[in-house]
């Protein structure tokens, strides 16, 4: 109800489809596949449990009207040498402290990292060496959640492939939906890049074995890395 005592009309959360461009980037861009990562001061380029620097798959600025996380910068990393489904480590539905570093069986540590940063400044001096840099564009749309259709998008509500999943952060807050990636998108890589294990092609990478990916994050922002990739399909 507004200040005049009238009932306000409910509006669905804003959402944006993510479109991947075709012209390779030759300079930093905040919305990109691969490219030059934008990281907060003191935030190092994430590393896998194996010690290798993780590959930047994509990054983007979330529009200001995205629920909970508007205006923040989303970055998705995964090790080029390790490719598997994510495995939420939780007791009941509550994730363990620093769940983003927890072992991911059969691995002794984490091979992925997703960051939500408030306002990272200048980009890294060197670009992501493996994933080919391409621009991303966001356009407002409405996801009808039709059968057999899943969009690469931020905001709105998750279009679960199988069934809704929910988790609580170690801090106690229920994780909120940020982004979804459809099944088996291919991220082209540069010549000479390491071949991804269990990949689709030698010249492309996939996220989490090509599963559909749903990114859920802590709305209290207890840590920039408090983002969980949930896999289905």
Question: PLM ranges: what are they?
Answer:
Residues 1-233:
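Preference for intrinsically disordered or flexible, low-complexity segments
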